[in-house]
Amino acid sequence: MSKRVLVSGGSRGIGRATAMVLSAQGYQVVINYLRNHEAATETLGAIEAAGGSAYLLPFDVADREAAKAAITHDIETRGLYWGVVSNAGIAADAAFPLLSGADWDRVLHTNLDAFYNLLQPVVLPMIRAHQGGRIITLSSAAGLVGNRGQTNYAASKAGIIGATKALAQELAKRQITVNSVAPGLIDTDMIAALPKDELRRMIPMQRFGKPEEVAALVAFLLSEAAAYITGQVISVNGGLV
């Protein structure tokens, strides 16, 4: 039986690329998404057309009860996850004096609270199974060095890094690794409205990253070859930081 991996925000961008790469490597991918059913269905279709295995699991990662119910039911009916990729995230940029409380809360709930909402229902079954496991979180260059106009986003991603390191220490003796991938400027919808020429000049490699390049690192961290790597934050940023 194929190992199963839950990928939150798996319908677009880095999440979609991760789902595609993992399915090509023989994992069964659980594609989480919230609103964009068309994109999720397209991703599922692309995986199946390539001979991979996947299914959809829609829920809001910011909704604690909904996440717990969906994940618990999925584990009880289909079995344990080998890995979880906590990828779903949003941004709502504004200079701090103009940042609304609603946008602060929305970004923290979706990005940081999702760490608890997504992983808390998964960890105890992993421990009880005594089979090890892999947890990968998606942080950001902004979580490492901050970024103007992204106080809320940077706070959420820095929080993910701290939580990742703490959980890694808890789970290491269980052979469950917990690592974070920190992308820089990746060519996804998240940077579509930004001044690309100006941003490109800031990157030592003079180009944006590809979602597949991030996905390749995630796939490695999920593999047996990465069994002795835990509590780490690995950047994919073309030398940006």
Protein language model regions, located:
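Residue(s) in the substrate-gating loop at a strand-loop-helix junction
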Residues: 140
